[in-house]
Amino acid sequence: MKTVVFAYHDMGCLGIEALLAAGYEISAIFTHTDNPGEKAFYGSVARLAAERGIPVYAPDNVNHPLWVERIAQLSPEVIFSFYYRHLICDEILQLAPAGAFNLHGSLLPKYRGRAPLNWVLVNGETETGVTLHRMVKRADAGAIVAQLRIAIAPDDIAITLHHKLCHAARQLLEQTLPAIKHGNILEIAQRENEATCFGRRTPEDSFLEWHKPASVLHNMVRAVADPWPGAFSYVGNQKFTVWSSRVHSHAPAAQPGSVISVAPLLIACGDGALEIVTGQAGDGITMQGSQLAQTLGLVQGSRLNSQPACAARRRTRVLILGVNGFIGNHLTERLLREDHYEVYGLDIGSDAISRFLNHPHFHFVEGDISIHSEWIEYHVKKCDVVLPLVAIATPIEYTRNPLRVFELDFEENLRIIRYCVKYRKRIIFPSTSEVYGMCSDKYFDEDHSNLIVGPVNKPRWIYSVSKQLLDRVIWAYGEKEGLQFTLFRPFNWMGPRLDNLNAARIGSSRAITQLILNLVEGSPIKLIDGGKQKRCFTDIRDGIEALYRIIENAGNRCDGEIINIGNPDNEASIEELGEMLLASFEKHPLRHHFPPFAGFRVVESSSYYGKGYQDVEHRKPSIRNARRCLDWEPKIDMQETIDETLDFFLRTVDLTDKPS
């Protein structure tokens, strides 16, 4: 049976050996070049392929159409993936009549995603296993073909568990590969309600937070012990690594991070104490705990910290351009709630941020980004993170002022992007759900959905294509010049301070603000083309929490990622939004101050937006990247958002001349 194999690591080597032993004909093997920054303790798939006389390739992007075509020419009957690190596109998966199968190092549907071996140890699991499953477009979600369970012993560390998983994988493949070859397999669908998903781990994820229980920290040590990078902490600015540890449940009470004793080296935790059995100071040699204490100059009562002492004193400087806008002012509030951010902001007004102007860690300048270029360049250079939130993002302006949209949204932002490249600063760029345009996918996916817009004579797409081109420019700068970036795509965020009623009076506002103005003034609610267009509305608090986690960037998981931020469960048509808003309005305690409801009125989009407008029937996000990179889920129901948004705007209305 002819197969094409995607493989890496020890699991890749044993998978190839198992296929050959089962009589499969391997036409080609796709693998990865080794990362020089990664400790290669595992077998080489490339070397094994060469020794076996099998063609082997390591393309940067195996999903490129040229590689898809080359794989198609190999006419594989079945495809296998053994610890290949990139998602394989659906076009490749569909090439094999018998399907594609992946070996995953957990008991699916638990621990989908990356580094399951390390995550099960971090989380203190007592059981894991290996799963062979059918590959589908969504990672690790296909039907299960075979599973083998293994126990995790209390003294297991990452490398011993790795060896157990390899042994189990050999057994599983020996039992299952002949059945696949003869088309004699039983597949069991995964239970989605039991699925968990985890993202990539980096060395920075393994710092020891002493306020946590000793058992949690011990599990961290087990999960990243040699040959992984190790768990670490600091004495002042001196980093040290913990290679092995032991939990003491009944240690004397002390402040977390305090040294209880040096022989043995015992550190107080949030619950219990952690004995450092072996460790390493800086880039030195491994030594026992008592010697490590001596090397680090520790005595009873010394304090350890989770980050360098100098780093702990310096706040992260965040530059927000457009700080007075809807996202900018809510994000400022979230950042200032913590004690480790310094926020620098620029905008043409300050009404929404007036509550922060006296905050010691908020620095505001009133100005226009097209004029204050020197100030902007200086602050890009000065700050750590840059968020250029300035944009014209109201649909009526796309047809009314397309050139102004292009000049501000594209040209001014491109200049800021180039400053970030010049000074090597991290940029978090607000893309938009508009870039998906008229995509027909059920869920708009950051990595796979096509971005489809209308013809040139429809100027409403100038905003979408301006943002899309900036996305592509940022991506290219990341690939070619090492720009550290994250693109985020908001899906219809709503909440207090979204636009204002004066903007709605001239038609330059988002949908809910316009609808609220209609209710306040007693004018008919206009349903553009019947209001059947569906959107997924997201509470600003949910959106800002996701954006805050992007700024935090735990373990650098957001670097180089595109992340939809939306609530796929809060889908409603504009007509349904209007009905929900009306119901909330009729129950509001200030209702009697406003005129009677004037009804709904259906209008054509051309009469409202002008010629050159096209609408989009649906726009629902896939949020798998947000789940993977941010451990984030939207929580707030749409009705709650509507109630709070309406209440905010009604309380801004001058009621002195309103009927009571």
Curated annotation (Swiss-Prot):
UDP-alpha-D-glucuronate binds at residues 393, 398, 432-433, 460, 492, 526-535, 613. Its EC number is 2.1.2.13, 1.1.1.305. Residues 1-304 are annotated as: Formyltransferase ArnAFT. It catalyses: UDP-alpha-D-glucuronate + NAD(+) = UDP-beta-L-threo-pentopyranos-4-ulose + CO2 + NADH; UDP-4-amino-4-deoxy-beta-L-arabinose + (6R)-10-formyltetrahydrofolate = UDP-4-deoxy-4-formamido-beta-L-arabinose + (6S)-5,6,7,8-tetrahydrofolate + H(+). Keywords: Antibiotic resistance, Lipid A biosynthesis, Lipid biosynthesis, Lipid metabolism, Lipopolysaccharide biosynthesis, Multifunctional enzyme, NAD, Oxidoreductase, Transferase. The keyword Transferase applies. GO terms for molecular function: carboxy-lyase activity; UDP-4-amino-4-deoxy-L-arabinose formyltransferase activity; UDP-glucuronate dehydrogenase activity. GO terms for cellular component: membrane. GO terms for biological process: lipid A biosynthetic process; lipopolysaccharide biosynthetic process; response to antibiotic. Pathway: Nucleotide-sugar biosynthesis; UDP-4-deoxy-4-formamido-beta-L-arabinose biosynthesis; UDP-4-deoxy-4-formamido-beta-L-arabinose from UDP-alpha-D-glucuronate: step 1/3; Nucleotide-sugar biosynthesis; UDP-4-deoxy-4-formamido-beta-L-arabinose biosynthesis; UDP-4-deoxy-4-formamido-beta-L-arabinose from UDP-alpha-D-glucuronate: step 3/3; Bacterial outer membrane biogenesis; lipopolysaccharide biosynthesis. Residues 314-660 are annotated as: Dehydrogenase ArnADH. The active site is at H104 (proton donor), E434 (proton acceptor), R619 (proton donor). Bifunctional enzyme that catalyzes the oxidative decarboxylation of UDP-glucuronic acid (UDP-GlcUA) to UDP-4-keto-arabinose (UDP-Ara4O) and the addition of a formyl group to UDP-4-amino-4-deoxy-L-arabinose (UDP-L-Ara4N) to form UDP-L-4-formamido-arabinose (UDP-L-Ara4FN). The modified arabinose is attached to lipid A and is required for resistance to polymyxin and cationic antimicrobial peptides. This is Bifunctional polymyxin resistance protein ArnA.
